[in-house]
Regions:
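Feature marks short, highly hydrophobic, charge-poor N-terminal signal-anchor/signal peptide-like helices
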Residues: 1-8
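Short hydrophobic "helix-edge" motifs at membrane interfaces and signal-peptide entry regions
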Residues: 8-10, 109-110
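Membrane-proximal soluble regions of multi-pass membrane proteins
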Residues: 25-77
Length: 160
């Protein structure tokens, strides 16, 4: 029982970490900002966030939803996306267990979550998200192709 609970805690933590990265994508992709090299910062004062300001969900709660430096409000989107992604990961792993399907569905749900928020805010869907979903689908389909192929429908009827 305890190892199962620990596994679900780890899965949730992994989900909120990915959710934190989704927030980076949600903000930076529509603004054409670099998602790799640009440091996270306060949108109000430009304060570069320290590692302890970036702990998903917990930093937001510890800071009361405000910037450490200027005390400006931080959008509630950040903890909501992180928590929602963590819960989605829990549900996927609860349904499919430790499998390739779980990994693929988690990546798919995370991508759709980020894509939905960007679309809601900008009325645009970045092409990169569609290409990622396409690649994910092709890889998943190729992985399961050998398990699901049935040639019985290709047999010719016999004449008697």
């Amino acid at each position: 029982m305890l190892p199962t609970i620990l596994l679900y805690i780890v899965i949730f933590l992994y989900g909120i970490v990915i959710g934190s990265f989704l927030n980076v994508l949600i903000y930076r992709i529509p603004n054409k900002e670099n998602i790799v090299t640009t440091r996270s910062h306060c949108m109000n004062c430009g304060y570069q966030l320290r590692w302890y300001d970036l702990v998903p969900l917990f930093s937001y709660l510890a800071l009361g939803g405000r910037c450490r430096k200027c005390k400006a409000h931080i959008s509630v989107q950040y903890p909501v996306i992180e928590a929602l992604n963590g819960v989605l990961y829990l549900l996927v792993f609860w349904k499919y267990g430790m499998s390739v399907d779980s990994l693929v569905y988690c990546l798919l749900f995370s991508t759709l979550l980020a894509l939905s928020v960007i679309d809601f805010r900008t009325y645009e869907i970045p092409v990169g998200f569609n290409l990622f979903i396409l690649a994910l689908g092709l890889i998943h389909g190729a992985f399961h192709y050998t398990q699901s192929v049935s040639y019985t429908h290709l047999t010719l009827p016999t004449i008697r």
